[in-house]
A protein has these predicted regions:
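Phosphate/diphosphate ligand-binding glycine-rich loop within oxidoreductases
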Residues: 1-81
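Glycine-rich adenosine-cofactor-binding loop
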Residues: 65-68, 78, 87-109
Length: 109
């Protein structure tokens, strides 16, 4: 049975929390998407390229696998909306983590 809980973790406690046995998988939000990259034993191709993790899984051997599903979520949204971006321009406002992900997704289309 899966249970979802909110963990509000102060930055000073992040490493200890990640090493704890209080979780098997996490959805990571701002401000920790970049900070958890260095804690991962393995990264998906997207997480490696973006240096941003929003999904963490603890493997049976205790190592952490990091992925970035934001990229695929944005790509899915564009593709399923019926918008053909070919030959079009896009304006990405902002310079935070989401803008890096959106820019990478747009470059794939």
């Amino acid at each position: 049975m899966l249970r979802c809980r909110l963990f509000e973790v102060p930055k000073a406690d992040l490493d200890a929390f990640l090493c704890s046995d209080r979780w098997d998988g996490l959805n990571v939000t701002i401000p920790y998407k970049k900070a958890v990259v260095s804690c991962c034993g393995e990264l998906s191709e997207a997480a490696e390229r973006l240096q941003s993790v929003n999904t963490l899984v603890r493997r049976p051997d205790g190592t952490l696998y990091g992925d970035n599903t934001d990229l695929f979520g944005f790509l899915y949204m564009v593709r399923s909306s019926g918008i053909d971006p070919a030959g079009k321009k896009a304006l990405v406002l902002g310079s935070g983590g989401a803008s890096v992900t959106v820019k990478a997704a747009l470059e794939q289309l």
